[in-house]
Regions:
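Feature activates predominantly on carbohydrate-active enzymes
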Residues: 1-159, 163-170, 174-177, 193-199
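Alpha-helical scaffolding within the catalytic cores
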Residues: 178-187
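Short, surface-exposed basic-aromatic patches at helix termini and helix-loop junctions that form
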Residues: 187-193
Length: 201
């Protein structure tokens, strides 16, 4: 259960006595987080055992990571085709998305991720997720075809993540159901090492 910060009272005590407890649990999912202004209170986070993204996600990559993985200021000039096709042109930029049907984007992302994974061999989870911004997804003919078949741009995203999950089966990939990817796809299903973070705003 999640409660607001105001729903509990913490009374400071000098001594706390607890009975002997032996309790083991296997969580239904590996990472649990809720995000609100209450998270700024460290006691609240501790009480509800909310995890810090930096403790779980490689290089603290937990949301809106497209531009961290393939920065547009590094790749955009030479490879504008990596980025969203909108109103007749590819538009690299900090908030641009990727053209997820372009195999060169997949290859470039694999190279970047492989380097990140090698630098952090003891960590398993990373987010590969859209940049912040609505209606910025790629509308090239290939992406539009997948979007129409899947009934949502989330289909393109899950297909891309599934390919990454197959390429790196020992890693876990997180992504977002957020804004234009909020609705689930009709056909494709995420692989076991792909998890979806619901971000309903």
């Amino acid at each position: 259960s999640y409660f607001a910060k105001e729903a509990y009272t913490l009374t400071p005590m000098q001594t706390i006595t607890l009975p002997a407890i032996h309790r083991e649990e296997t969580p239904a999912f590996r990472y649990r987080q809720t995000y609100s202004y209450n998270n700024d209170d460290p006691v609240y986070k501790l009480w509800f055992r909310l995890e810090e993204p930096k403790d779980m996600f490689i290089e603290n990559m937990w949301v809106h990571t497209f531009n961290r993985i393939l920065p547009s200021d590094r790749f955009g000039k030479e490879h504008p085709e990596y980025y969203s096709f909108i109103n007749g042109e590819h538009r690299p930029g900090h908030n641009s998305q990727w053209c997820l049907t372009n195999p060169k984007v997949f290859d470039a992302a694999v190279r970047q991720l492989d380097s990140i994974f090698k630098a952090h061999p003891d960590m398993k989870m990373i987010s590969v997720s859209q940049n912040d911004g609505n209606n910025t997804n790629c509308s090239c003919p290939a992406c539009k075809e997948v979007d129409e078949y899947e009934g949502s741009p989330s289909g393109n995203l899950i297909r891309f993540l599934n390919k990454l999950a197959e390429r790196f089966p020992d890693k876990e990939f997180s992504t977002l159901a957020y804004l234009y990817t909020m609705n689930p796809p009709k056909h494709v299903k995420p692989l076991p090492n792909v998890n979806i973070m619901l971000c309903d705003i």
